[in-house]
């Protein structure tokens, strides 16, 4: 048996040796032996050494933005330029397989350290989040526009469209949004104050915008000092992914004079990116800085530089180990405007001085005043109480500083008066709202009416939407009794609104309500809590404290020094405190010298516009909108608090008075009327009209500006020279006479409309910033001609 086995083995060996496979088998055995030996050497013999010196190599490509082009005036004067500055950046280099909890802790610890370093050296982190702190230290949305607010909420929840939001998500308050993000980012908002939490959320949210492409860096602080840059570099080993980069920041010298023309730059939003064409999306990314308004926006494609590209390797710590290739970026093109910089600044200052003069001519040393008693609007005064109130209402001074531990004497005195008054008013309001037999609205004091109006119209309708305006029936008897006749109380009105399902209970919280009484109790509880922290309600309280003299003008003016709005003047400050300096005289002098401007006070009048054109070429030499703003604070990384202040201020600063204001053209239209009269044959160069100061052909009789005087007999040239109204009243009237000798206003206005169109007044002017369409009314009255 064994012999048979041995014979078979011999046969197999003989067959194998004679086969051509033997060569392959030998080669396979040799290579396998070499591979096994090499693995043994690497893993066993040198394994520990290689582990200690291991570096992970990752290939990355990063785009480098081109420098934005400059903007010059017609004479080559710089209006917008770029400046190199240090920025603190972070790149998310934490491995993607790291647990969320661990990753949050690493990032939060890193950002906390960055925040400490930045603030210790006098700088600040980014503040371009959609939520800010109001004057009472509570969270509020930076956007007041509802669509913009919802767009922000959709971005927070990762929704592409506003319509994708649930009702609960749409109704979230700013505080609920912050708490939602704190939970996502692993931040314990109960352990820190609101300001710290908001800064941390700002940085985490900014990083989150780049989460889909982690190799992009996120700016945490821009335009930082050398001290901050040095401190970051010294601690870089303990700050994962944090670095100092040189950025090109947009600068606007004399920004307030040109902001309405130039606009500002900022990071492109998701909505702006989505609106781009497919070709444009190839040139832009979500980290790009683009023009947000004005010339910066209109000529963005011209000003934008061409991006460069760098391809490199990084190790497992994010350090660059090798640069593979580099393409240099190219600078954008410059833009030259027809504007004359010096003329623009001079026109702005001239307009500001003119407005200040008007304010001073109307300013009256009384705290309260009823303008309805005046028969002629030219006699209406501005009570100084309104001016004092403007310091708070328009946030020239910061009322949230009044109650701080380091508050100054005037701040403390005002705050003590305010807290006592607020407690009294809230108690009275709640008592009336709980009283079924509360006085009717018409029987309330003027002050109490203002509080009730604020609660119903501003808070419940506009701000929170609890009282649904679209559900209210305008012809409903109870609605009329409240809104028009004023014969019922707010208690009765709100209870009726509940019975008619005009109240949105989903906005009162998560509680379930089974009866009308429970709903009303829920509304009152909501109001009581909301009003305690409502800065706009606080402003209303201050208004009546000032009107009553409980908070004095001297106290308000002293706070201007205490908060550094004006440089400290010890004599004036002490005089305001001890009563030796008259507050009215102090304010009058500050307005006269433009240390306090009409734009800051936002009294009427507080705004205006000037346009200067070259009559030979049509070039726009100056285009002033007053008041202006500091567009440097909105460019690059937006100052959200400043933006909100501008957006909610009473001066309506973002509205361009020079290009968007719709108003009657006044005497400038006389050239068109004269052209129409000459071309249509109603007058010639020698036709005269006698001006007695009043046009008595119609009743009531419109007056010339020179009334009770008159210009006498004038021809068309003289009528333009003296800007005589009566000449053009008569001309307009004559153009409206039909073939039967009857006056037809449509006939006259059709002729005027024809020539207005010939002058181009029926279309946009062609300037490259937003303008309002000219509207030629279809049916004018004789007084409009």
Regions found by a protein language model. Give the residues of each.
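Conserved small/polar residues in nucleotide/adenosyl-binding loops
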Residues: 774-783
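Short, glycine/proline-biased beta-turn/loop segments that scaffold the active-site neighborhood
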Residues: 626, 634-637, 663-725, 761-771
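Short glycine/serine- and small hydrophobic-enriched flexible loop segments
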Residues: 352, 675-682, 730-734
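Flexible glycine/proline-enriched surface loops and loop-helix/loop-strand junctions
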Residues: 328-332, 652-660, 701, 709-714, ...
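Membrane-proximal periplasmic segments of bacterial cell-envelope enzymes
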Residues: 1-591, 599-609, 615, 628, ...
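Short active-site loop at a secondary-structure junction
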Residues: 333-338, 602-608, 641-669, 685-689, ...
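Short, solvent-exposed cationic patches
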Residues: 93-115, 588-589, 637-666
